[in-house]
Amino acid sequence: MESITISQLKNWKRNKKKIAAITAYDFSFSRLFSNCGIPVILIGDSLGMTIQGHTSTLPVKIEDIAYHTKAVRKGAPNTFLISDLPFMSYYDTKQALKNTAKIIRSGANMIKMEGGKWLIEIIRELSNRLILICGHIGLIPQSFHYLGGYKVQGRKENDANKLIDEALLLEEAGINMLILECIPEKLAKKITESLSIPVIGIGSGKNTDGQILVMHDLLGITEGKTPSFTKNFLSESDSIQKAIQKYIYEVEHSIYPSKKHSF
């Protein structure tokens, strides 16, 4: 697979080619995903739960993300890598610049930050320094205490309008991609059509420019109850490789997510 670039991903949006993304945290799985044709991998702070055994993403540190980014880059040299900036690692511009540099040096193509209007000035500073940025709005796990838990966001008209405004402001400030998590399908469609950058959904319906899932959910190895928007692709396949290929196919052909995976 040739190296995936942000220019290609923007072309995919224009050409209505769906983007199938997944999380990964190590060499072996990232190599497998890359060989299957996954174009985008997120080194997510979800590793706090899936790898470290915490009950949330909050304990994850920048050093953890850097370590796992290096491992994933070795396994997926040509895949487009997005790495999370974890909780309280970008509370001001100076800290955001310092930690972004650490993550980019570790092999990421792009960094991801959760939040809305309060991030605008930080995003502008990073964008002015030609850093690729992925925004993340809707359900933002780093703020689950404030949100009252892991709940669908944007159901009420005022909340929906706020998310639309935030998406537009983030794009104007300089983000190059946006993740929408756990918002109603119609709202996600409206936001996706309003932006010129790729919009990736998780629990936000099929009308975004692509989908992302936590690998443990996709493979059915998550402990306990999984979110209703996830699908166990391994249960319908006889190997991990075929499960990943099925995921890619279903995303690219708008089979997944179906209505039962949407809000």
From Swiss-Prot:
Catalytic activity: 3-methyl-2-oxobutanoate + (6R)-5,10-methylene-5,6,7,8-tetrahydrofolate + H2O = 2-dehydropantoate + (6S)-5,6,7,8-tetrahydrofolate
Cofactor(s) it depends on: Mg(2+)
A GO BP entry: pantothenate biosynthetic process
Protein name, as recorded: 3-methyl-2-oxobutanoate hydroxymethyltransferase
Subunit and interaction comment: Homodecamer; pentamer of dimers.
Main location (coarse class): cytoplasm
Catalytic center residues: E181 (proton acceptor)
Pfam families with a match to the protein in the record: Pantoate_transf
Biological role stated in the UniProt entry: Catalyzes the reversible reaction in which hydroxymethyl group from 5,10-methylenetetrahydrofolate is transferred onto alpha-ketoisovalerate to form ketopantoate.
Positions bound to Mg(2+): D45, D84, E114
Entry keyword set: Cytoplasm, Magnesium, Metal-binding, Pantothenate biosynthesis, Transferase
Gene giving rise to this polypeptide: panB
A GO CC term attached to the entry: cytoplasm
CC cofactor note: Binds 1 Mg(2+) ion per subunit.
PANTHER family: 3-METHYL-2-OXOBUTANOATE HYDROXYMETHYLTRANSFERASE
Pathway per the UniProt entry: Cofactor biosynthesis; (R)-pantothenate biosynthesis; (R)-pantoate from 3-methyl-2-oxobutanoate: step 1/2
Binding residue positions for 3-methyl-2-oxobutanoate: D45, S46, D84, K112
Subcellular location as annotated: Cytoplasm
Species per Swiss-Prot/TrEMBL record: Buchnera aphidicola subsp. Acyrthosiphon pisum (strain 5A)
GO molecular function: 3-methyl-2-oxobutanoate hydroxymethyltransferase activity; magnesium ion binding
Enzyme category, top tier: transferase
InterPro entries linked to this entry: Pantoate_hydroxy_MeTrfase (IPR003700), Pyrv/PenolPyrv_kinase-like_dom (IPR015813), Pyrv_kinase-like_dom_sf (IPR040442)
UniProt family annotation: Belongs to the PanB family.
Record keyword Transcription present: no
